[in-house]
Amino acid sequence: MILYDRLINKEILEFASPSTKFFYCGKDPNKHSLPQEETNKMMVTLAKKGHTVTRLKGGDPFVFGRGGEEAEVLANHNIPFEIVPGITSGIAAPAYAGIPVTHRDFSSSVAFVTAVNKSGMDKEQYWEHLANGPETLCVYMGVKRLPEICDLLTKHGRSSETPVALVHMGTSIRQKTITGTLGNIVDKAHQIT
């Protein structure tokens, strides 16, 4: 049994045994094929019926991939599991574009952050903290909030000349990268689609 996500390369499914059953559990930004609770329930139900269950996710399951939540559910049901780490898109996509996230001369720190902040921290505090924190920010799920993110970062101290890259379809043959600065990337963002 393979429960797979939207962001995996579908060609990898061809390596599964012909008898494998596949379940799509992807989450589009505007539509979830299954609520997370249903995915969790399916993993537990299939495992308790004696099936070997693979939860196949793109990137690293513990970096904005709900892998921690899913592992917790399995542990709470005493279901043994193994985590196979992946390479998060915040590392893979910039590398594929030839952009290092750290560089001895420019950036000695990097943070992986989400534009969908549910930590309870005030939005202004969150972006002020990031504006004055690590040199490199890899922002996940931020396309729809790009103008607001750029405004908040510059408002709280990041230079409008800070280099920015937008990467679409990272590490695929359709990857597209647009570069600019915090001050002009919003105007260039239309080039990504």
Which role does the model predict for each range below?
Residues 38, 48-54, 109, 117-193:
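A contiguous loop/helix-start segment that scaffolds small-molecule binding in enzyme catalytic cores
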Residues 58-133, 176-184:
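Class I SAM-dependent methyltransferase SAM-binding "motif I" and its flanking Rossmann-like core
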Residues 13-14, 45, 102-103, 128-130, ...:
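Short secondary-structure boundary/capping segments
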Residues 5-7, 115, 169:
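Cofactor-binding loop segments of dinucleotide-utilizing enzymes, especially the Rossmann-like FAD-
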Residues 1-87, 186-187:
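Class I S-adenosyl-L-methionine
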Residues 12, 74, 93-94, 149, ...:
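Hydrophobic packing residues within well-ordered alpha-helices of enzyme cores
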